[in-house]
Amino acid sequence: MLEVAKVTKNDIVYDLGCGDGRIVVTAAKKFGCKAYGFDVDPKRIKESLDNVKKNRVEQLVTIKQQDIFTLDLSKASVVTLYLLPSLNVKLIPQLKKLKPGSRIVSHDFDMAGVEPDEGFPITMKSNGIEHMIYRWTAPIKVKKEE
């Protein structure tokens, strides 16, 4: 996902629904960028914090228990999503506020009504299953209903 978003050291990555924190940890370790993980589940926040500490990336990664649907995304240059399609769609109003040029990437699920710039098929090394990674660039263009 991070490669598809073309993350660099200068990016600020926001992972919405960060789960165990693997994306923000990878962003910090592989690219040396600042990364923020957000989740509402206290158990997932603890897992993320443990993962950050275990990987010694506390100086680059921040984990917050916060509602992703009210989150200020103005500082993000990359937003990662691994959420159900209905949640991706619910995030559209927030994603429309991203600064121009910001990248959004989603694992497996697109956003109904918003055409991705590109879709990348990837095959998981662990099990050989193919997944899709979708990428959008802000400002996103929502299709008008006819």
Regions found by a protein language model. Give the residues of each.
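Conserved alpha-helix/loop element of class I SAM-dependent methyltransferases that forms part
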Residues: 1-10
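Glycine-rich SAM-binding Motif I of class I
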Residues: 21-25
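A short SAM/SAH-binding and catalytic strip from SAM-dependent methyltransferases
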Residues: 74-90
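C-terminal substrate-binding/active-site "lid" region of AdoMet-derived donor-dependent transferases
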Residues: 86-146
